[in-house]
Amino acid sequence: MEVSKIRIHDLPEEERPRERLIKNGPESLSNAELLGIVLRTGSREENVISLCSRILMEYNIKQLSLANVSKLMQVNGIGKAKAAQIAAVFELARRLETFVEEPKRKISSPKDVYTLMYPKMREQKKEKFITLYLDTKNQILKEEVVSIGSLNASIVHPREVFKSALMESSASVIMVHNHPSGDPSPSREDIMVTEKLVEGGKLLGIDILDHIIIGDGRYVSLKDEGFVK
């Protein structure tokens, strides 16, 4: 059988481009193999790597990145779907070149947390427990919803809070939840959950900076209340 007609799935697994990328990284693949992973399938006459090799003989990478869908469809074996896939990949690459990451938001006080979170939580009909994961400069790395529903120790487990903290290499955590009643006064359950998480953070070397309870136009800081030490 001609090499160009051998299907990729007929190759030994260790020779397939996708499996090699996973094992050895994308830099280990040729341009044709990388493009083949994007297109996934070839044509009746040739496998995807043979097709991509032929495409790259007609266009170099720069030319390919500038070709529109109509131009790409002039290549034998390239229909609308494959042309769109190629155009989409290069458009993403162009957008990456001009991408500017927004500066991370810094938290300096409980009021900063309230200002950030109140618009997101004021219309909530159920209690929502959110964690803010911070770096060493108190800049937000990630915001994550941990639970929805009445706050209690069985729902908000330290494992759920600190799993993301460890994955994000967070230096500290701020916890936030709302009281749909509008009264931000902490319940006994709020205090128990806070104390449990503070102790868990100490074991892992991750500081719990505060637990903010948001009500109707006001908030309570459990650190200011003396429950976060």
From Swiss-Prot:
It holds the Pfam family RadC. This is UPF0758 protein MM_2791. Residues 106-228 form the MPN domain. A motif (JAMM motif) lies at residues 177-190. One of its GO terms (biological process) is proteolysis. GO terms for molecular function: metal ion binding; metallopeptidase activity. It comes from the Archaea. PANTHER family: DNA REPAIR PROTEIN RADC, UPF0758 PROTEIN YEES-RELATED. Zn(2+) binds at H177, H179, D190. It comes from Methanosarcina mazei (strain ATCC BAA-159 / DSM 3647 / Goe1 / Go1 / JCM 11833 / OCM 88). Belongs to the UPF0758 family. Transmembrane segments: none annotated. Keywords: Hydrolase, Metal-binding, Metalloprotease, Protease, Zinc.
